[in-house]
């Protein structure tokens, strides 16, 4: 694919233009740097749908901002998520979603531990939808009335999550594994922290983090590069170019003080969540990419539905088919989690430990490593199938200063020794924890 990427043709506000390419995948995307500091990623695809993602490197773990004299100012837990919800409120009190619907476009948003993203998709008139998205995210409106209303909505959401055995088992696990890191707190915050949020706090955090230099715009579909650049010129003032990257500096989290916790929930069956904490410092850039790939392969080798542990537990009736596992990592945190339903969670936990010990004695399987590395590679390639997947993939890598195609080289260069080292480092009983959500009636009857 050929992109027009002459700085002169793209306008005076584009200070650099690069084409990221992957010959193996026959994929490429254009990466532009706007004078405001905004990174603009464009993948031109002859597809019926256009998808755009406007993201900010600001998530639930970013609870400290620089105050007067650069003294850290603590903000309540849940502000990033609260702010995301409030961005949909227009100045007249209406909802921006109505404007997108009028264009025939869909709009959505989400907040994670370390980023917030706003997305749109449409089959026609992408310029109008993109302009609307840029306006919505860069022109906030926070007032006491809308903030008060939002507090009620989010507090109700928190109460609903408190009744979910899966949500509670997972959240209690994080509180047990991390004593100080903000990842231990729910992305939505808690009732006490939500009540502390004010319009002033929201404006302060928006001004601090929602600056173009801390944001990425990713667009995929049958689009024109020049039209996207012109919209950015129109909606993103260059005079607000500042360095707004979160100054994330988390203290080294101490070792876990306890390895078991349980909580009562209104459910029919116990839900367990096993955590495996990585106590080493979390790298950044391409080293973080490598660690992510290695742990993804390792967790698939050990805990996927094709692995011995899942099948033996299921055949013996110790777990139900509802089962999930995954890895999560970011600045200052890294862990693997395994979740499911079981009448006897403690027995499942013992079997888990026995299983890891047997793998340690025999050594991980190189055959399993090669198979799961191929699967990881194939899954990444498949992610370039739809405009939504492509736009989100480009954003997720670019916001960490990476090209999406860096992952291909990372997977190819990963060795069996990398996985064995990770296994030996993480798979120790001191790193394990078990959180159980027990049905209320069951615990009361014990």
Feature annotation, model-predicted:
Residues 3-51:
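N- or domain-start disorder-to-order transition segments that initiate the globular core
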Residues 3-11, 86, 90, 95-246, ...:
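Charge-rich, well-structured scaffold segments of protease-associated domains
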Residues 30-36, 253-254, 261-265:
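Short acidic-hydrophobic surface loop/beta-edge motif
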Residues 39-43, 206-207, 259-263:
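Short, surface-exposed beta-strand/loop micro-motifs that present aromatic residues
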Residues 48-60:
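Short, surface-exposed, low-complexity cationic segments
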Residues 59-77:
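Short pre-active-site segment immediately N-terminal to the catalytic Zn-binding motif
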Residues 77-85, 89:
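Active-site recognition of the HExxH zinc-binding catalytic motif
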């Amino acid at each position: 694919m050929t992109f027009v990427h002459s700085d002169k043709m793209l306008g005076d506000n584009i200070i650099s233009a690069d084409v990221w390419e992957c010959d193996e995948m026959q994929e490429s995307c254009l990466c532009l740097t706007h004078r405001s500091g905004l990174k603009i990623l464009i993948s031109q695809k002859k597809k019926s749908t256009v998808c755009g993602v406007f993201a900010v490197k600001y998530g639930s773990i970013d609870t400290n901002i620089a105050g007067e004299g650069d003294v850290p100012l603590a903000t309540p837990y849940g502000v990033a998520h609260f702010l995301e919800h409030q961005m949909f409120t227009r100045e007249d009190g209406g909802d921006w979603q109505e404007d997108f619907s009028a264009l025939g476009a869909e709009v959505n948003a989400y907040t994670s531990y370390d980023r917030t993203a706003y997305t749109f998709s449409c089959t026609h008139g992408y310029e109008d939808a993109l302009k609307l998205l840029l306006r919505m995210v860069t022109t906030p409106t926070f007032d006491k009335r809308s903030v008060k209303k939002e507090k009620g909505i989010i507090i109700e959401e928190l109460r609903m999550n408190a009744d979910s055995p899966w949500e509670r088992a997972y959240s209690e696990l994080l509180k047990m594994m991390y004593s100080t890191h903000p990842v231990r707190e729910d992305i939505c915050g808690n009732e006490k922290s939500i009540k502390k949020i004010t319009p002033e706090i929201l404006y302060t955090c928006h001004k601090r983090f929602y600056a173009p230099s801390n944001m990425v715009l990713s667009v995929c579909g049958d689009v024109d590069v020049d039209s996207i650049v012109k919209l950015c010129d129109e909606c993103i003032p260059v005079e607000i170019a500042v360095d707004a990257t979160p100054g994330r500096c988390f203290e080294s989290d101490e070792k876990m003080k306890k390895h078991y916790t349980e909580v009562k929930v209104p459910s029919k069956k116990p839900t367990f969540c096993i955590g495996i904490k990585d106590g080493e410092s979390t790298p950044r850039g391409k080293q973080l990419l490598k660690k992510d790939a290695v742990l993804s392969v390792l967790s698939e080798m050990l805990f996927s539905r094709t692995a011995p542990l899942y099948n033996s537990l299921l055949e013996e009736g110790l777990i139900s088919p509802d089962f999930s596992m995954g890895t999560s990592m970011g600045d200052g945190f890294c862990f693997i989690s395994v979740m499911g339903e079981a009448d006897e969670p403690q027995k499942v936990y013992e079997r888990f430990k026995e299983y890891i010990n047997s793998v340690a004695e025999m050594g991980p399987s190189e055959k399993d490593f090669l198979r799961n590395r191929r699967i990881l590679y194939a899954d990444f390639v498949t992610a370039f199938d739809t405009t939504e997947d492509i736009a989100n993939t480009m954003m997720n890598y670019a916001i960490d200063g990476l090209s999406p195609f860096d992952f291909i080289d990372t997977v190819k260069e990963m060795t069996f020794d990398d996985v064995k080292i990770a296994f030996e480092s993480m798979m120790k009983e001191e790193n394990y924890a078990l959180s159980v959500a027990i049905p209320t009636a069951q615990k009361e009857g014990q």
